[in-house]
Amino acid sequence: FSVVANSLPYLWKGFQYTVQLTAISAVGGLFFGTLLAMARLSSLKLLSNFAAGYVNLMRSIPLVLVIFWFFFLVPMILQGVTGGDRPPQVGAERTAIITFIMFEAAYFCEIMRAGIQSIPKGQVYSAYALGLTYGQSMRLIILPQAFRNMIPVLLTQTIILFQDTSLV
């Protein structure tokens, strides 16, 4: 048991990093997922198609591949764009945070979109009848109700995110 006891400080540090990475990625993914969901539900076809393409692409690629692409390919792309003689170093921690946020945003987008669409259209029409704008009706009426419906699925996706942090 001495091996386990000697490893406890390292395990504790790893646990703290895992929780930190999960929290940052969940908050960032939820923020960008909400924006993507609003874009997917937009009446602007270009915006809606871009968001749908992003979500479909990210959900069809394994996370480990996204991490590898970001870590190895993005520095080469940045070198080509900036014209530098060496590719800039992105860093492992920055790669992990950015890729997890990008990846989870696609999943949170679908959860958010389903939650928003679960609210009856009468709620939206009532908000418009009260004189609220689209943004006000979403912020004050639709999203609070939708979040209540989405909490179980959002927590499940966050648990999956916690498990996915083992890749980094």
What are these regions (language model features)?
Residues 1-168:
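Transmembrane alpha-helices and adjacent helix-loop boundaries
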